[in-house]
């Protein structure tokens, strides 16, 4: 039986698990939990600047630390679990020190570190592996970073993305494949939406190149801006563009579809299936409210 999967994030009053304390808990996955700790030690200036939780807010919204830990352990349960976190050594140190102070035992935990996973999968040093930086690269709606529930949700999403790209790397890691990279380009052709899609597409291509440095990536979706900004978006033009993409795809060794399929991606998947070109799926980016679907 597969162990339940959770993602955990702590906001803390400092960096030392033996001197500082947990100020906020965020847990998502098989079951969710979130709470502020009302009686945590005072936050260091750096910690306060990051999480923005004032002592007054903690007292007003929080619960005593012993109660919060008890509720967290109740949600985790007594059976073995998998716990995803971005920088596992940090959160693990605080959880173990907290449980030791309260005299409670923890369930068996398989720690999964998305920071380590991202560094191993994509060793390119020019790509930041910070949680916020990766969320921006992938175009995810983040809300308020450095709040526990938000960061836990992002860590879980990153874990799922890393799993997808590990699978792609296993299948395309040999040789020097030419890979067609497709993303959910949408919008009404205005310059703002065009540039947004273009930036997302090339940020994703840089990530893919960091994972598969020996591959050559074809990114036609990133070039649609030059056509769209000219104002020519008639049906005939669109059909000709898709046909050109299909011809290009036929010369590639693989297709990677990123995100919720757009009409163009559905067409490209059909071309790949008809031509026997292997295709793979990976998460894409979130579309902002001002882009029409």
Regions found by a protein language model. Give the residues of each.
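Conserved catalytic or regulatory cores that recognize and/or transform ribose-phosphate-containing ligands
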Residues: 170-293
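Short hydrophobic/aromatic-enriched beta-strand-loop microsegments
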Residues: 105-112, 279-281
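Acidic, divalent-metal-coordinating active-site segment for phosphoryl/phosphodiester hydrolysis
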Residues: 147-160, 267-271
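Conserved non-catalytic scaffold segment of RNase H-like nuclease domains
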Residues: 1-108, 125-146
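Anionic group-transfer/hydrolysis microenvironments
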Residues: 11-13, 26, 87-88, 115, ...
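Acidic two-metal-ion nuclease catalytic site recognized across multiple nuclease folds
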Residues: 1-3, 137, 156-176
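Short alpha-helix plus adjacent loop in nuclease-associated cores
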Residues: 112-129
